[in-house]
Amino acid sequence: MCGIFGYCNFLIEKTRGEIIDTLIEGLQALEYKEYDSSGISIQGDELESLNIYKQTGKISSLKEEIDLYNLNKNLPFISHCGIAHTRRATHGGLRRANCHPHNSDPSNEFVVVHNGVITNFANLKALLMAKGYVFKSDTDTECIPKLYKHIYDTSIELGYNLDFHVLTNLVLKELEGSYGLLCTSSHFPDEVVAARKGSPLVIGVKGKTDMDVNFVEVEYLDQEEDYLKLNTQTKSSGNVLAAAPVKYNTCLRKSPPFVHNT
């Protein structure tokens, strides 16, 4: 049982302190009495860097953990994407290493928060460990950011420069089970990917003016042909080792309008 939350400011300056406060407030809104750990990921001092802060206990313990780092909370960000997570331990016991967010590597190239159950995580973990990836947790989630990195690195080696959403499609095709997830990456600063299968996920957009109307483009796999079909690159059938692209159809449609009365 988990709750995930993300916050993005785009071309609207926010300080690091404001961003952290928003992420914490989002977690507090999701917090349930049985939740026993939480964490956030935010941009570091450099553009292409991500920092992770997490702790067992209530969200108040996470706030205390963050304060230990004496961060410059006045540092401004014109654009920024942060993600957060709170959980009750299921896969993996109650220890800090099992808290989300989980990363792909010590440099935090890919960072993921996840709600759901990846039923084939044991097979994915065995495959990735055989490729040299080191797992720090007992969770099913940790295979996701490492899968991101493996497919990203393999694609670069093969000469394919994938964007974030195409890369995500490759990752999702390997996952079995249910998920609502958010992913950020140092390779794609100021971007966040949100995906769901089975688990709930809600996207909200705040308007700039009264009665502002916004839309979000949402990609669906294997939908009816009355939606716009896009040809995007993905790997051939088989396991994660295959990264040579072939074409498949996805469908793009706009969300219902977000109408704001600010």
Curated annotation (Swiss-Prot):
InterPro entries listed in its UniProt record: GATase_2_dom (IPR017932), GFAT_N (IPR047084), Ntn_hydrolases_N (IPR029055)
Keywords of this entry: Aminotransferase, Glutamine amidotransferase, Transferase
Signal peptide: none
Hydrolase listed as a keyword: no
Glutamine amidotransferase type-2 domain mapped to chain residues: 2-262
Gene Ontology MF term list: glutamine-fructose-6-phosphate transaminase (isomerizing) activity
Catalytic residues (UniProt): 2
Pathway involvement of the protein, from the record: Nucleotide-sugar biosynthesis; UDP-N-acetyl-alpha-D-glucosamine biosynthesis; alpha-D-glucosamine 6-phosphate from D-fructose 6-phosphate: step 1/1
PROSITE patterns xrefs: GATASE_TYPE_2
Record field: catalytic activity: D-fructose 6-phosphate + L-glutamine = D-glucosamine 6-phosphate + L-glutamate
EC class of the enzyme, as a word: transferase
This enzyme's EC code(s): 2.6.1.16
Gene Ontology BP annotations: chitin biosynthetic process; fructose 6-phosphate metabolic process; protein N-linked glycosylation; UDP-N-acetylglucosamine biosynthetic process; UDP-N-acetylglucosamine metabolic process
Function: Involved in amino sugar synthesis (formation of chitin, supplies the amino sugars of asparagine-linked oligosaccharides of glycoproteins).
Matches recorded under PANTHER family: GLUCOSAMINE--FRUCTOSE-6-PHOSPHATE AMINOTRANSFERASE, ISOMERIZING, GLUTAMINE--FRUCTOSE-6-PHOSPHATE TRANSAMINASE (ISOMERIZING)
Protein name (record): Putative glutamine--fructose-6-phosphate aminotransferase [isomerizing]
Biological classification of the source: Eukaryota, Fungi, Dikarya, Ascomycota, Saccharomycotina
